[in-house]
Structure formats: structure tokens, C-alpha cells
UniProtKB/Swiss-Prot annotation:
HAMAP family listed in its UniProt record: Ribosomal_bL33 (MF_00294)
SUPFAM superfamilies: Zn-binding ribosomal proteins
Keyword hit for Membrane: no
InterPro entries linked: Ribosomal_bL33, Ribosomal_bL33_CS, Ribosomal_bL33_sf, Ribosomal_zn-bd
UniProt keyword annotations, A-Z: Ribonucleoprotein, Ribosomal protein
UniProt protein name: Large ribosomal subunit protein bL33A
Lineage, opening ranks: Bacteria, Bacillati, Actinomycetota, Actinomycetes, Kitasatosporales
Superkingdom assignment: Bacteria
């Protein structure tokens, strides 16, 4: 398998509406659904949910 097929690069966009994004990789075999992580948003200055953007 090619490198990009199993662990694609995804963007995690803030749900606070600031437009801030994190970029990470995810394993499609373990997490086939859209990922949601609670991370720090420096624009909002608090922890918010970040959802996977395709």
C-alpha cells in the first residue's frame, strides 16, 4: 500500500468559528468515521472541539 492511502493528512477545524486548523494524520482502518478532538484554540483562547474537514 502507498503511504498516503492508509494514513491520509486531514485538517481539524475549530468549531468555535475562528477558522483555526490543526493538520494531522489519521489511520483510516482504526478511525473510518470523522474524527473529533478537543484541542486548544489560540484565537478563542480556550479548549474547543475540532472536527475533521474533508
Amino acid at each position: 500500500m502507498a503511504r498516503n492511502e492508509l494514513r491520509p493528512v486531514i485538517k481539524l477545524r475549530s468549531t468555535a468559528g475562528t477558522g483555526f486548523t490543526y493538520v494531522t494524520r489519521k489511520n483510516r482502518r482504526n478511525d473510518p468515521d470523522r474524527m473529533t478532538l478537543r484541542k486548544y484554540d489560540p484565537i478563542a483562547r480556550r479548549h474547543v472541539d475540532f472536527r475533521e474537514e474533508r
